[in-house]
Amino acid sequence: MKTVYYYSRPNCALCEEGLLTLRLVQEDLAFDLQILNIEEDDALHEKYMLMIPVVVCDGEVIQYGNLDYPTVYEGLDDEI
């Protein structure tokens, strides 16, 4: 089973909404979800601080910012 990485940070309303969208996609596609707090890693913080939330699978950014179900589903369906 593939692992999908979700980069976010605490106290981020957009990240919370994005996680709900990602959980809906997870109901339709089987994947492991790893949630990573970018504030715990300087390199991740520098890379993603202006993009969060970010969905990544196999090293490819599927979508970032304001996540929507169709884009995330289609992007992950191609990878999984």
Each model region followed by its residue ranges:
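Local sequence-structure signature of Cys/Sec-based thiol-disulfide redox active-site neighborhoods
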Residues: 1-22
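Small/polar loops that bind or transfer phosphate-bearing groups
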Residues: 7, 36, 64
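Generic recognition of short, well-ordered alpha-helical segments
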Residues: 17-20, 46-50, 67
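Conserved helix-turn-beta segment immediately C-terminal to the redox Cys motif
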Residues: 21-36
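Thioredoxin-like thiol-disulfide oxidoreductase module
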Residues: 34-51
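A short, hydrophobic beta-strand/beta-hairpin element that forms part of a small beta-sheet core
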Residues: 53-61
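Non-catalytic, surface beta->alpha helical segment in thiol-disulfide oxidoreductase systems
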Residues: 60-80
